Amino acid sequence: GFDGDFFAHMEEIDLCWRMQLAGYRVRIVPRSRVYHLGGGTLQTDSPAKVFYNHRNNLAMLYKCASPAQRLCVAVARPALDLLAALSYLMQGRRDNFRAVFRAWGDFIRWHGALARKRREIRANRKGSAAENIYRGSVVLRYLFGRRTFGGMMR
């Protein structure tokens, strides 16, 4: 089920990724409707939201990504997070700046627990971590006008 250590962000992505790694197929129901209150738990620009987004994403990648993917993340992610933090600082959003570093602190403190979860995921693995990764750049697709998930897949 859901990882009880996650709160408010990325718990559903983490669950789907772990299910795929365990050999399950994640399916969609095209006619379904989802009513989602964005910012219902945390305000859009709150430091807590920045913290959970960064922390949970780091934890999810550590738990689920292949060794090669983790190497790429280990090289790129600190630089990208530093750029994000500096961007917050230049905008005068000091709390968001600090939230990025708090997320890294939590991630480092969680290392032992995450390593145990990773071993459990790998022991139950029947699928590949690579086959479900989008190979393009979401950032570039967004910048070139593909602002929806469906638009990015074209």
Regions found by a protein language model. Name each.
Residues 115-154:
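Glycine-rich phosphate/pyrophosphate-binding loop
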